[in-house]
Regions:
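Pyridoxal 5′-phosphate
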Residues: 1-197, 201
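N-terminal low-complexity segments that are often proline-rich with Ser/Thr-Pro
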Residues: 203-205
Length: 205
């Protein structure tokens, strides 16, 4: 039974891989939803790569799921949150976005489609801008994934998150896509008991 469950689980991972055109199934992580996916990234990336005074760039149209985790990190580590403004048409001001980058910018996290305005943000262009500054990019695809083709390799997204229920999947399931080279650099988000029980005096592996 456990083997069958594992096979079904990995088959689901392959389905998601094909759906978003990830390079491999090891780049697909299952979570409890978009919110947990973002919290995972903020926690792991923030702990590993961000110090007091470092900066994250988000947009003015983010869902609270992509605001509050960064605010908590700011309270805990003293990072700065920079916000991309928009015009009267509900479009992000890309010239202002470019100006927000500094040597302290560590990551950008922006929604692909606004859940309030319906604005489709040019995330492929925005990712290219971030990469030109050597900065990784998180795409919140919770609202875009049901309505448009999302190809992580075409976007060149470093991370991308969404929830299964948005595409008629089960509730309580989410996806975190991450490029393998980034996932390999992130520390564990949570721990668990594996096949052996390490002594509290020993380090975890």
């Amino acid at each position: 039974l456990s083997q069958q469950a594992t096979e079904l689980h990995e088959a689901s991972r392959e389905t998601v891989r094909r759906f978003i055109n990830a390079a491999g199934t090891n780049e697909v992580i299952f979570t409890r939803g978009t919110t947990e996916s973002i919290n995972l990234l903020v926690s792991s990336f923030g702990d590993e790569f961000m110090q007091e005074g470092d900066e994250v760039i988000v947009s003015v149209m983010e869902h609270h799921s992509n605001i509050v985790p960064w605010q908590l990190l700011a309270a805990r580590k003293g990072i700065a949150i920079k916000v991309i403004p928009m015009n009267d048409k509900g479009e992000l001001l890309l010239d202002e976005y470019e100006k927000l980058f500094s040597e302290r910018t560590k990551i950008v996290s922006v929604v692909q489609v606004s859940n309030v305005l319906g604005t489709v943000n040019p995330v492929k262009e925005m990712i290219a801008t971030a990469h030109a500054h050597g900065v990784p990019f998180i795409v919140d695809a919770a609202q875009s994934i049901p309505h448009m083709k999302v190809d992580v390799q075409d976007l060149d997204a470093d991370f991308l998150v969404f929830s299964a229920h948005k595409i008629y999947g089960p509730t309580g399931v989410g996806v975190l896509y991450g490029k393998e080279e980034w996932l390999d650099r992130l520390p564990p988000y949570q721990g668990c008991l594996l096949y052996t029980s390490p002594s509290p005096r020993d380090g975890a592996t």
